[in-house]
């Protein structure tokens, strides 16, 4: 993996090594070669209007501490904290030029996944329809989870939306056989052979958030689970193919690509994100 910073960024980037780039992503997108990527996955800021906080915690067993799994007690100690604003006056004005360039960077068989929440998903879909054409809309994926604050004044929002667009609706790559299958909800209705094989996930994905004590936990705010991103990379890229995330955050796409024999380019302007991703990816 090669680390680049904005002050040393060339006008044209070649895809020789995996790249982790600390820079304005629009400048990087202009420097990348066109039609080079099997897959672009982005998880842009959700425009929540607040601040996202990164907390690094140490968790230790403690008799009489907070009840945890199996009734065992534990204590959490905050080691460090950093945050960033998640608030844009003109969210689409910020995102649209990046989406237009993303389309140009996709190979003819390439696919774009845009990870959003309920605040902006419908606006971004209309913009993507304008940029790609409605015929290039492939899927709306729902990642459902049960975590976070509850409210009694409305239905609690417990899902994210992932919009999927292809460069060419007649030529895009989708390998359903490469995706881990999941159990049937009623296996007795499908026969033993199909029940043993499992089924291809539908457009609604039930998947936990990153576990507090999980090996992949970085403490970075908005970190997405490797299991969710692994489905995307497995289905929509080929071994050895190039994948891009220009809102890289904690580097989950890079971690998954390293596991699945894909190449990656990760971009983020936040030094804290680059530090987390670098620590996660060094040596992979």
At which residue positions do the language-model features occur?
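Core catalytic lobe of class I
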Residues: 1-284
